[in-house]
Amino acid sequence: MSIRVGIVGISGFGGGEAMRLVAGHPSFELVYAAGEGSAGQRLAERFPGVPAKLADLVIEKWDPARLPSLDVLFASLPTGASRDALARVPDDVKIVDIGGDHRYADGWTYGLADVWPQEIASKTRIANPGCFPAAALTPLAPLLADKLISPDTIVIDAKTGISGAGRGGGTGFGYAESNENLIPYGLLRHVHMPEIERSIARISGGSATGLVFTPHLVPMTRGILATIYARGRATTAQCLDAARRFYEGSAFVRVTDKPPQTKWAAGSNLAFVSYAADPERNLVIALGVVDNLGKGAAGQAVQNANLMCGLPETAGLEGAPVWP
């Protein structure tokens, strides 16, 4: 029997990617789509390449009081837009919030699926991690768990594609402004900082108050590369070994000897991690790559929904990355 799925915020990049993944999922059936900017349109008008079986599904105006019978709801709304509305969704509907309103909120489980999968299976309210936390915490988790680095010395330098700014865009995100340009933003106050700090402290049992995180927009469509520096006396071999043990049996995290590239993960739910360390300099470098719309958003959301529904976590996510 199919699992009835709805997507709120389908007009945006995250919601659109969720639609693409749900459309190809062996157990999910998309029966409801809502989007403020596209209400009244057929799905094929908004996404001309949508599968024929979904072409005539009409996008509705988001109203939690008028939901059809659903098993799972994906919410991909701007920060501040989902907290009150999702509270009115019936308790028996499983929700994965791709937006930022419920990360570490009471009553919600933080869905970093490759680190804490056992906590997700029995829950009905999952807060998907942000794209930068997904890219940074995945390589950091093994080092923190094995006490190979000091959690209060972490510096994260991250680069993301323009789709990370969302479909709404705005000044600074147009082609003429972003092409051949590198744009730092959110210095010292990025919205993902508290989420990263709290997760580092949770994994390590120590303080992350010294965290430095600087994101940059780069002129590519999708992908995140996080280059992370921390103090520690570990060797490169010890870091790689810790990651291989931590992610043994993982369907999505790949530990690689050479530095990963954003193209490796494009269009997929994969995460690539690698390390370089110099114990004489008390320095560890960790590298993490994800697709910001995949593992950083809709891919991880589907992975979380699979776990919530008792399905194989790889269901609907087994496609290879797009190359080149």
Swiss-Prot record:
Function: Catalyzes the NADPH-dependent reduction of N-acetyl-5-glutamyl phosphate to yield N-acetyl-L-glutamate 5-semialdehyde.
Principal subcellular localization: cytoplasm
Catalytic activity: N-acetyl-L-glutamate 5-semialdehyde + phosphate + NADP(+) = N-acetyl-L-glutamyl 5-phosphate + NADPH + H(+)
Name under which the protein is recorded: N-acetyl-gamma-glutamyl-phosphate reductase
GO function term, MF aspect, one: N-acetyl-gamma-glutamyl-phosphate reductase activity
Gene name of the record: argC
Enzyme class: oxidoreductase
Annotated keywords: Amino-acid biosynthesis, Arginine biosynthesis, Cytoplasm, NADP, Oxidoreductase
Active site: residue positions: 131
NCBIfam families assigned: argC (TIGR01850)
